[in-house]
UniProtKB/Swiss-Prot annotation:
Its main location: cytoplasm. SMART domains: WD40. PANTHER family: PROTEIN PHOSPHATASE PP2A REGULATORY SUBUNIT B. This is Serine/threonine-protein phosphatase 2A 55 kDa regulatory subunit B beta isoform. PP2A consists of a common heterodimeric core enzyme, composed of a 36 kDa catalytic subunit (subunit C) and a 65 kDa constant regulatory subunit (PR65 or subunit A), that associates with a variety of regulatory subunits. Proteins that associate with the core dimer include three families of regulatory subunits B (the R2/B/PR55/B55, R3/B''/PR72/PR130/PR59 and R5/B'/B56 families), the 48 kDa variable regulatory subunit, viral proteins, and cell signaling molecules. Interacts with TOMM22. Interacts with IER5 (via N- and C-terminal regions). One of its GO terms (molecular function) is protein phosphatase regulator activity. The modification Phosphothreonine is found at T298. The keyword Ribonucleoprotein does not apply. It comes from Sus scrofa (Pig). SUPFAM superfamilies: WD40 repeat-like. The gene is PPP2R2B.
Length: 443
């Protein structure tokens, strides 16, 4: 990545594009696999679409960042909880890949209540010549079998199959907001509003409760769990965030189940900022460990913060995402925008941070140069392999030609979900029902 992020030239391309969107088409999860060769998206209709990267050729260097549809399958269906008279949406809340161990790929997907483990594999041969079955798979009468045949494998068109290998259900009373694969690759955790459960991939009927903040009296409830993630290298360590802006680092060696809500990382409250809207805006919507350093990144409504695990009382870095909205928090509360859950991601070297905003804008912050840039993902100003231009939001009355007034922002167009290729400067951005790929300019 170039040092001057303001002058960076970025190409973009569409991956998924609908001229008209239904509620089911809205993308709700985006995730690269560990190599970056596959990119998975989930939507509110319960579908998972997997894209595969085009093989690079010497004659088509400009296509090095292009992805095509690899597999599509229905992960979750709408359900109804008859005991509680509640509808369970099919919406995919999170997708997490497992490291590839063989020719097949494995991923976790979850809706509000159920986590599923999927196997995605290729098949280019089919068996023929069964003795007890005919060519259509029907059983043959043994009395008609006069010769013994040896089954053989015949070539066939490549078929990508997605099959559910495990279904992890009936363990969450509240809505699941996070799943995270442990670094031992044998376990993973799922977090809802009040509890975090630890699962073994081989056991579907039992999980262990490793965090519980539910009070004895629900009238005393003051916060909920908003996000959780395992440490990328230490299998005993995980972190979770809360709606009060607190971050709790937990060690499973110290306690089998973390109870209560003690503060671990939290910025002191500003006595001058005690309004109800500002308290809501301090709720953390995403938390991520860095890959290279002992840092944690959090996203609240207005900012992205980076925390050093050795400094509990303040973040070491704070980046303003859309500070121009601070004066509009009351109206954003009235239209429920203040409850939007924005995600944040690191690049492969943890040197650049990316997160979304409104009007289909997304922000990038270079931690080394302290430069930032606002870019837009939209069909109106973007064509495949076009170069994106930085955008600026004007707060005052006067604005330049290339600026947009804060009063003109479209709050129905929001980028909540983003993903960064693990080793290259290729990013995926979900803008409502459209998926965009961006990459550094190819010379």
């Amino acid at each position: 990545m170039e040092e001057d992020i303001d002058t960076r030239k970025i190409n973009n391309s569409f991956l998924r594009d609908h001229s008209y969107a239904t509620e089911a088409d809205i993308i709700s999860a985006v995730e690269f696999n560990h190599t970056g060769e596959l990119l998975a998206t989930g939507d509110k209709g319960g579908r998972v679409v997997i894209f595969q990267r085009e093989q690079e050729s010497k004659n088509q260097v400009h296509r090095r960042g292009e992805y095509n549809v690899y597999s599509t399958f229905q992960s979750h269906e709408p359900e109804f909880d008859y005991l509680k008279s509640l509808e369970i949406e099919e919406k995919i809340n999170k997708i997490r890949w497992l490291p590839q161990q063989n020719a097949a790929y494995f991923l976790l997907s979850t809706n509000d209540k159920t986590v599923k483990l999927w196997k995605v594999s290729e098949r280019d041969k089919r068996p023929e010549g069964y003795n007890l079955k005919d060519e259509e798979g029907r059983l043959r009468d043994p009395a008609t079998i006069t010769t013994l045949r040896v089954p053989v494998l015949r070539p066939m068109d490549l078929m990508v199959e997605a099959t559910p290998r495990r279904v992890f259900a009936n363990a969450h009373t509240y809505h699941i907001n996070s799943i995270s694969v442990n670094s031992d690759y044998e376990t993973y955790m799922s977090a809802d509003d009040l509890r975090i459960n630890l699962w073994n991939f081989e056991i579907t009927n039992q999980s262990f409760n490793i965090a519980d903040i539910k009070p004895a009296n629900m009238e005393e409830l003051t916060e909920v769990i908003t996000a959780a993630e395992f440490h990328p290298h230490h299998c005993n360590t995980f972190v979770y965030s809360s709606s009060k802006g607190t971050i709790r680092l937990c060690d499973m060696r110290a306690s089998a189940c973390v109870t209560g809500t003690p503060n671990f990382l939290k910025e002191p409250e500003d006595p001058s900022n005690r309004s109800f809207s500002l308290k809501l805006s301090s709720s953390i919507s995403d938390v991520k460990f860095s890959q290279q350093w002992e840092d944690i990144m959090t996203r609240d409504y207005l900012t992205v913060k980076v925390w050093d695990l050795n400094m509990e009382n303040r973040p070491i870095e704070t980046y303003q995402v859309h500070n121009y909205l601070r004066s509009k928090l009351c109206s954003l509360y009235e239209n429920d925008c203040i409850f939007d859950k924005f995600e944040c991601v690191w690049n492969g070297s943890d040197s650049v941070i990316m997160t979304g905003s409104y009007n289909n804008f997304f922000r990038m912050f270079d931690r080394n140069t302290k430069r930032d840039v606002t870019l837009e993902a939209s069909r109106e100003n973007s064509k495949p392999r076009a170069i994106l231009k930085p955008r600026k939001v004007c707060v005052g009355g006067k604005r330049r030609k290339d600026e947009i007034s804060v009063d003109s922002l479209d709050f129905s167009k929001k980028i909540l979900h983003t993903a960064w290729h693990p080793s290259e400067n290729i990013i995926a951005v979900a803008a409502t029902n459209n998926l965009y790929i961006f990459q550094d300019k190819v010379n």
